Design a protein with these regions (language model features):
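Beta1/beta-strand and adjacent pyrophosphate-binding region of the FAD-binding site
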Residues: 337-344
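Membrane-embedded alpha-helical bundles of multi-pass integral membrane proteins
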Residues: 12-216
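Reductase modules of NAD(P)H-dependent flavoproteins
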Residues: 200, 285, 291, 296-315, ...
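Non-transmembrane, juxtamembrane loop and terminal tail segments
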Residues: 2-27, 228-245, 253
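Histidine-anchored nucleotide/phosphate-binding helix
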Residues: 275, 348-366, 390
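Membrane-proximal cytosolic interface modules of multi-pass membrane proteins
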Residues: 170, 175, 179, 183-187, ...
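Ferredoxin-reductase
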Residues: 228-317, 379-380, 416
């Protein structure tokens, strides 16, 4: 660590505000859901409560039968269906109205989707059971007449979507998640045929979704992209450098498509990826951008294998489409005096983009509050370091030109399954984020710390809770988190 004189902050928080910060931002694991902060848990409970209120409200005559209840469950599912489509739009109306980006709003899409599933399960399951009791025929219970046939097929569509939306499938078989989600078309068709109220409920939401798809189509086709370099890096990562005139911020992500990778399927297969370059990177005045894709599924694995074998993958041959950029870090890192960037595995991509951007601004003399940057990267072994070895070495070399008495650039790489000899950069084992945050707090004395973290859910939860534990009256630790999957 370089020695620098970083002035202490005179800020002082009240005990109440510190505890509110700790409680409101603490992370929990909720069975059936991804890890979430306490504030998200409150929103989830409010959402569930609101749905239960509409399900269980007293009926007009004060008397409700089982049939009344299950039919009301269908209407609650319809009400949620009105929101599930606009909540999945990337060019979201919610960004315009309340400033919440797609990656934050998508969790509400998942919640409404699951609520639709549970309400249809209550509605359809009860009717199927009643029909089976009356006929003792499974086929008649499921497909006995048009009402049962269309209802069963609509429910089957939802079952497929819910199963393939699991976080494990989104991460390791993104194409299965991507393609299975198009069964929502059958959900709409059979839903309309099943109930006359379905179309009025979902018409507006579907209209917003269609508009979003048109915007994405235009954005991804209107600007040409030139692939400058495609490079397979060991342990299954493909580095793609491309040229495109666009504005973006460090830490943003996009969706990429390589139409001629494996046509015809690749014509419509998109994959989410964080931009690993900084907005300022240029080569002779030409804006260059970089993405790193880890071979975790069919699409990314094929890209890596073809790049490694040089099978029709020269930069001039590979075509690329780009939908984005999207998202925005919840913290303005350039406005924070002390910044810690934590990443696990390929989750380093948005964090190294932020690191590059901060160092570029420090070197260029642009207005910047950041004086201390702590970069923590957790990877299995030294081979994974090759993903960004040249970038980190180049960054550290450039940062050496900064005055030691003003700036700190501290890089630590933790190897969890390697016997590499520890050095000033490499360390064996998993880090204690609580210890690292305590060390930074002790060194700087007072003032807020901005933490960015991207990696596995377990890591994000640990970092968040360590940040809350180290928040006190002399400085709060604020966290911006990103996950692997959308």
């Amino acid at each position: 660590m370089s020695v620098a004189v970083v002035p202490e902050s005179n800020i002082m928080y009240s005990t109440v505000s510190v505890w509110m910060h700790k409680i409101w931002n603490s992370a929990f694991h909720v069975v059936g859901f991804e890890s979430m902060e306490f504030n998200e848990l409150v929103l989830l409970l409010l959402f569930i409560t609101l749905n239960l209120i509409f399900l269980l409200l007293p009926f007009e005559n004060g008397v409700s039968t089982a049939s009344d209840l299950v039919n009301r469950a269908a209407h609650v599912a319809l009400a949620n269906s009105a929101f599930v489509f606009p909540l999945a739009t990337r060019n979201s109306v919610f960004v315009t109205l309340i400033g919440v980006p797609f990656e934050r709003i998508i969790k509400f899409h998942r919640w409404t989707g699951r609520m639709i599933f549970f309400m249809i399960a209550l509605h359809g399951g009860t009717h199927i059971q009643q029909q089976y009791s009356a006929t003792e025929s499974i086929s008649k219970a499921l497909f006995g007449d048009n009402q049962y046939l269309t209802g069963s097929l609509a429910f089957l569509s939802i079952i497929i979507i819910v199963i393939t939306s699991h976080a494990v499938i989104r991460r390791f078989a993104f194409e299965a998640f991507w393609w299975s989600h198009f069964t929502f078309i059958f959900f709409i068709i059979f839903g309309v045929l099943h109930n006359e109220w379905f179309a009025p409920y979902v018409a507006f939401g579907i209209s917003l979704y269609v508009v979003d798809r048109l915007i994405r189509f235009v954005k991804s086709n209107i600007k040409s992209i030139k692939v400058v370099n495609i490079e397979p890096i060991q342990t299954g990562v493909t580095r793609v450098v491309f040229e495109r005139d666009m504005h973006y911020e460090a830490g943003q992500y996009a969706f990429v498509n390589f139409p001629n990778l494996n046509a015809p399927l690749s014509l419509v297969t998109w994959h989410p990826v964080s931009l690993s370059s900084a907005p300022s990177i240029e080569d002779d005045g030409i804006p260059l951008h970089t993405v790193h894709l880890k071979a975790a599924g069919g699409f990314t694995k094929m890209l890596y294998e073809k790049a490694r074998n040089q099978s029709g993958m020269s930069p001039g041959v590979l075509r690329m489409k780009f939908d984005g950029p999207y998202g925005k870090p919840s913290l303005e890192f350039s406005e924070q005096r002390t910044v810690m960037l934590v990443s696990g595995g390929i989750g380093v991509t948005p964090m190294i983009s932020i690191l590059r951007d901060l160092v570029d601004k420090q070197l260029s003399g642009l207005p910047l509050a950041t004086q201390a940057i702590y970069f923590i990267w957790v990877i299995p072994d030294i081979d994974s370091y090759a993903w960004f070895a040249s970038e980190l070495q180049e960054l550290l070399h450039r940062a050496s030109a900064l005055p030691d008495n003003k700036y700190i650039i501290d890089v630590k790489v933790f190897l969890t399954r390697s016997q590499t000899t520890p050095s000033s950069i490499f360390f064996q084992g998993r880090p204690s984020f609580d210890f690292l945050l305590k060390s930074v707090k002790d060194f700087h004395g007072s003032g807020d710390i901005a933490v960015g973290v991207c990696g596995p859910a377990v890591m994000i939860k640990e970092v968040k809770n360590s940040a809350m534990a180290r928040s006190d009256r002399y400085g709060l630790v604020n966290v911006h988190s990103e996950t692997y999957e959308l």
